[in-house]
């Protein structure tokens, strides 16, 4: 007879709770992001959406802008989001994605 593996359950974070928290923070910030960076759509994709994130995972975001930002504004957006969320983010622009990559992302993106 083996002892139950209670340590595994106690140390495993609930990834959906993490994703829910990230969604809530982004939704609350979305009006400001739309005004400041002219964002039309913002979506989450990648490991967080699939529930495969680890402690080293960044948050993958897909953004559609009404006006394409210059490099300085793009970097400022990434930094703002990293400060807001407390983790590394990777912001991809819908218009800059290769079609094959865009097709893969569109399968699991969750727009806010």
Residue locations for each model-derived region?
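Conserved histidines in hydrophobic membrane contexts and catalytic metal-binding motifs
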Residues: 44
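Short hydrophobic/aromatic beta-strand micro-patches
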Residues: 62-64
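Catalytic core of pol beta-like nucleotidyltransferases
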Residues: 1-41, 49-55, 66-112
